[in-house]
Amino acid sequence: MSFFLTTPAAIDLGVNIDHVATLRNARGTAYPDPVRAALAAEDAGADAITLHLREDRRHIVDADVRTLRPRVKTRMNLECAVTPEMLDIACEIRPHDACLVPEKRSELTTEGGLDVVGHFDAVRAACKQLADAGVRVSLFIDPDEAQIRAAHETGAPVIELHTGRYADAHDAAEQQREFERIATGVDAGIALGLKVNAGHGLHYTNVQAIAALPGIAELNIGHAIVAHAVFVGWDNAVREMKAIMVAARVAALHGGR
């Protein structure tokens, strides 16, 4: 648990280690080791470790998950698709959190939020299966009111709002519209009693506005940290992101946006 969790400015950083595994798999080597990266990220201030075990195992593989689980000191947040195989793995491994995400083999990265409205029965059943195994469930969804309501109705206690459209906005006006959608989504989630996280596409120059939203409990960030680490080192990259997030939250609470 980080020091920042004891302050009014509490906001957690979940460091996603997927692209450490991507770098490893590019040459089929045993390095860089994503488990080592996870443990170093915790030492540098990460509040959780996020990893996505995709069906095609394009980056994280089963051995990474199994090796990391008993060694993680903060929380493991395992992202996975709503499939029997992945749910069985999650129930066996029992991460602290399981974030259910949509998945397509053709995509480079997750392209949007889980359609809870359209797949309500399957998602609700998955939530129950995971909860019965003692795993806290999060649903990765777009900041859409109908999706947020449906997420609440599944019994999931946590949502993670997809920030990809905000991150990929082509101009300031579009980015502002997407930011307002996220802010509205945060308020809607909190009103329903949900813990609200956010993530996807956030980096060192666009995270400030999102981190400043007082209702967001956690941001999950990976690619930007891995990329920045090439130039400043892994520990520094994690520390810098956490510092930026906390500074943005503190400034917002004190009227200094």
UniProtKB/Swiss-Prot annotation:
EC number, UniProt record: 2.6.99.2
Example of a GO MF term: pyridoxine 5'-phosphate synthase activity
Location of the active site: 52, 79, 200
Broad enzyme group: transferase
InterPro entries: Aldolase_TIM (IPR013785), PyrdxlP_synth_PdxJ (IPR004569), Pyridoxine-5'_phos_synth (IPR036130)
Keyword Transferase: yes
GO CC, alphabetical: cytosol
Pfam families: PdxJ
This protein's record includes keyword Lipid metabolism: no
Keywords assigned by UniProt, alphabetized: Cytoplasm, Pyridoxine biosynthesis, Transferase
GO biological process, one term: pyridoxine biosynthetic process
Pathway where this protein functions: Cofactor biosynthesis; pyridoxine 5'-phosphate biosynthesis; pyridoxine 5'-phosphate from D-erythrose 4-phosphate: step 5/5
Binding site for 3-amino-2-oxopropyl phosphate: 16, 27, 201, 222-223
Binding annotation for 1-deoxy-D-xylulose 5-phosphate: 18-19, 54, 59, 109
Localization in the cell: Cytoplasm
Family: Belongs to the PNP synthase family.
Role this protein plays: Catalyzes the complicated ring closure reaction between the two acyclic compounds 1-deoxy-D-xylulose-5-phosphate (DXP) and 3-amino-2-oxopropyl phosphate (1-amino-acetone-3-phosphate or AAP) to form pyridoxine 5'-phosphate (PNP) and inorganic phosphate.
UniProt cross-references to HAMAP family, sorted A to Z: PdxJ
Name the UniProt record assigns to this protein: Pyridoxine 5'-phosphate synthase
Species annotation: Burkholderia pseudomallei (strain 1710b)
Record gene name: pdxJ
